[in-house]
Amino acid sequence: MADPQATNGTGAACAERDASDVGDARDEGAGRVVAVRGAVIDVAFDGGALPALNEALTIPVDGAAPILAEVHAHLSDAAVRALALGPTGGLRRGAAVRATGGPIRVPVGDAVLGRLLSVTGAPGDDGAALAADVERRPIHRGAPLLAEQKSANALFATGIKVIDLLAPLAQGGKAAMFGGAGVGKTVLVMELIHAMVERYRGISVFAGIGERSREGHEMLLDMRGSGVLGRTVLVYGQMNEPPGARWRVPLTALAIAEYFRDERAQNVLLLMDNVFRFVQAGAEVSGLLGRLPSRVGYQPTLASEVAALQERIASVEGAAVTAIEAVYVPADDFTDPAVTAIAAHVDSMVVLSRAMAAEGMYPAIDPVASSSILLDPLVVGEAHVEVAIEVRRVIEHYRELQDVIALLGIDELGADDRRLVGRARRLQRFLTQPFAVTEAFTGQAGASVEIADTIAGCRAILRGDCDDWRESSLYMVGTLDDARRKEAAAREADARREAAAAASGAGPGTTSDPASGSAEPQGARHGR
């Protein structure tokens, strides 16, 4: 079996820095370990006041880095129960313990830009160590007072058509990307980071909560290659780390974001992937601490833990924290208690559909299930709302007709329904879009589309201006002008093929179906 210290994401050296980052231990806070059960450590103190809840403890270990733990319960007048934030290999009863006199404090400011940090703010990349005098902030902090908070009613344009049209994000608000495994949540979050840097020149703070080490490494390399790392802070608590580390990573990211909001008056994009792993880590911690589980095995404090995290994500006068959260939906069950608890706090719900991903409709965002409180005429304008409602109505009606089409064929529909089906399919394809972050894999340049161009394109499709276009001309394009050029090129290619066939004396065996953009035998109909 691999050494636990060797398998930890940042290694023994990083853990050593972790322990030193919480400050010097106070002499009166000396104690000793009396029990160790996995990540749970019971500590007895000989005299004086016990360490407060959430206070950090350091435990030296012979031949290894000190262990950092956090107090979570007072067992008696002389004993506390703490949760280790790192591997407990090598720890034994009787080991000395020091209380630090306060919660974990993490580095903030310009020094952390472009860096990858652990839950305690220790560098986990190949960069230089942080200066000893770098400013630090505690990870535990209350939300701003209600009188200081600013409502989120300004549009946060992303350049992603389907989001901007049907589930617009609020600057200073909270949005969540809900989806099962493999439907594109992380790619969508990466594209939003790219959009933030390109459009707003703001600060991005990324919290990697319980995700794969490989994905974290790839994200670091991608950001270096794209040039956005210099205005980004990465905070990782990966899936191979103890539950305490994964549980506290969002708080570390929040502390850094709050510094740039409060002290620098800078807009911050806070991205968290994956918030479900935060809930999952909390369930592990709850079990380790001996609490009885609630529904589906979740911790009894699920609602309060999610609320404590989400309520700290707030905007104040002069600066906004815009949160975009990826949320894994276990078994695609949107009634899961963790999913419903998170959904109650967000302004915009972006729902990713496995069925759309299977059809290649990327981003695989469900236009019917996604929603936003910003889709209001007073915020985005009447024209935007009218087009969004009509797009949703047409696609929803098409879905209602799909069973009839599958059983009886499209010919059994009336003329109006056939026309609606064609427009719905074209709308679905127009709402697909190539991403800048996938350009290296697809070979197609990413497209960022203004909201006005998205509305104009959807209105033209709804009006019937594109009824005789190939569906393929609208697939993976930016604006309608891009689709128009694609359609013109396809028609020119068809004309050349027909001319060549006529010159060679070939018969009219096949024709290119203008609706689908594919060659089909004469008499075949689109929509089978």
Curated annotation (Swiss-Prot):
CDD domains: ATP-synt_F1_beta_C, ATP-synt_F1_beta_N, F1-ATPase_beta_CD
Cellular-component GO terms for this entry: plasma membrane; proton-transporting ATP synthase complex
Cell location: Cell inner membrane
The protein's assembly and partners: F-type ATPases have 2 components, CF(1) - the catalytic core - and CF(0) - the membrane proton channel. CF(1) has five subunits: alpha(3), beta(3), gamma(1), delta(1), epsilon(1). CF(0) has three main subunits: a(1), b(2) and c(9-12). The alpha and beta chains form an alternating ring which encloses part of the gamma chain. CF(1) is attached to CF(0) by a central stalk formed by the gamma and epsilon chains, while a peripheral stalk is formed by the delta and b chains.
Highest taxon above the source species: Bacteria
Signal peptide (residue range): none
Descriptive protein name: ATP synthase subunit beta 2
Function: Produces ATP from ADP in the presence of a proton gradient across the membrane. The catalytic sites are hosted primarily by the beta subunits.
Extent of Basic and acidic residues compositional bias: 15-27, 488-499
Family: Belongs to the ATPase alpha/beta chains family.
Chain residues that bind ATP: 179-186
GO molecular function: ATP binding; ATP hydrolysis activity; proton-transporting ATP synthase activity, rotational mechanism
Pfam families: ATP-synt_ab, ATP-synt_ab_N, ATP-synt_VA_C
Gene name for this UniProt entry: atpD2
Record keywords, A-Z: ATP synthesis, ATP-binding, Cell inner membrane, Cell membrane, CF(1), Hydrogen ion transport, Ion transport, Membrane, Nucleotide-binding, Translocase, Transport
Species whose genome carries this gene: Burkholderia pseudomallei (strain 1106a)
